[in-house]
Structure formats: structure tokens, C-alpha cells
Design a protein with these regions (language model features):
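Long, contiguous domain-sized segments
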Residues: 1-192
């Protein structure tokens, strides 16, 4: 928090989002809320990688006019767009961090790209479960999508999970193999 405040004229952040791959326990929720002052919204989100859900993208249908008959929506040739999300309850949403992306093909920016297409033709979403925080899912999903593109160790377009989970898991493995590192303070970037 001190590092943030030094770079922001002493201000505290308006919002802090904490990701975890297991559910938040009551004492963890209370500790997170107690760690920040009243001016900071604390959003606690469990990110579940494996779900049984899939999604199908449809082309829009057309209304008939004059002699032209109506056309029903039909499955699209490409999967759900990356960034699509669907709330399934007030505290849960499905988010597709993998999927069809426009604008990355240099020869034709209108061409859909789906990098997992050969191995997994239909992308599956991740399940987001909110334990603290409020509002809609748009800001939460956009922040998470941004974090799926921040893996500095490869040149892929995106990962399925955000770096907040990928690198914390990797860091835990390193500490498990080198327990003497626990007592020292290191820049987290050294472990990326």
C-alpha cells in the first residue's frame, strides 16, 4: 500500500480486486476488508478454471421485408468472442477468456482468430464467484481479461487465467522447493 501511495500523492486506491482459485473463508474476507480504509472498495473474486459450460456464437437473424423471407439466427463459423460474459446469479458470472478475437490478423483485421481452435474447437468459460464487492460484471471481467495478457514469459495473445493466479501458483511451487526463501523480501518480478 505504501508503494501505491508514494506513486499517487498519498491517495488510497478506489478499488482493489483480489483473485483466488479457492473460495474465500470468512476470516479471509474480514481480513481483506479490514486491510483497507472505507474509501477503497475491496472485491474478492474466486476464479474457477474448469466448468461444464460451453457457449455457441450465433449470426444475427434477419427480418423479412417485401419478398425477402426472414432468416433465423444460425451458428457462427467461429466460437464465442473472447471477453463475452454472462451473469448467472448476482454473485456469479461465466467469462470467456479464450475465444474468437478480431483485429489481430495483419492481412485482414476483420478476420477472426482463435488460437486454441485446433486443440479445443469450443472454448469453455471460467466461473467467477464474487465474495465481496458490488456492481455489474463489466469492470471485473475487463480487468481480468487484461491480466490474461500480461504473461511476460511468452508471446501468446492471452492465457486462460490471469497472471494474478498463474504467477502466485508458480511462486508457491518455488517456495515449496526452497523454503529458506520465506524469510527474505524479494521483488515478485524475480519469480516471473
Amino acid at each position: 500500500m505504501n508503494v501505491y501511495q508514494q506513486g499517487h500523492v498519498g491517495r488510497t486506491p478506489k478499488k482493489v480486486t483480489i483473485h483466488k482459485n479457492t473460495e474465500f473463508k470468512e476470516d479471509e474476507i474480514q481480513a481483506a476488508l479490514d486491510s483497507f480504509n472505507e474509501g477503497t472498495e475491496v472485491e474478492l473474486v474466486q476464479v474457477i478454471k474448469a466448468t461444464d459450460w460451453t457457449g455457441v456464437r450465433y449470426t444475427p437473424g434477419w427480418r423479412g421485408n417485401g419478398n425477402k423471407p426472414a432468416e433465423k439466427p444460425k451458428p457462427h463459423n467461429y466460437p464465442v468472442e473472447r471477453g463475452t460474459y454472462m451473469p448467472i446469479s448476482p454473485n456469479e458470472a461465466l467469462a470467456w477468456t479464450q475465444g474468437s478475437v478480431l483485429g489481430v490478423q495483419l492481412d485482414n483485421p476483420k478476420y477472426n482468430v482463435y488460437k486454441e481452435g485446433v486443440l479445443k474447437p469450443t472454448p469453455s468459460p471460467i466461473l467467477l464467484r464474487r465474495f465481496s464487492g458490488q456492481g455489474g460484471w463489466h469492470e471485473t471481467v475487463n480487468g481480468l481479461l487484461s491480466l490474461t495478457k500480461m504473461d511476460w514469459n511468452n508471446n501468446t495473445l492471452y492465457k486462460k487465467l490471469p497472471v494474478t493466479l498463474v504467477y502466485s501458483s508458480r511462486f508457491a511451487e518455488i517456495i515449496g522447493q526452497n523454503p529458506e526463501l520465506v524469510d527474505e523480501v524479494y521483488d515478485f518480478r524475480c519469480f516471473m
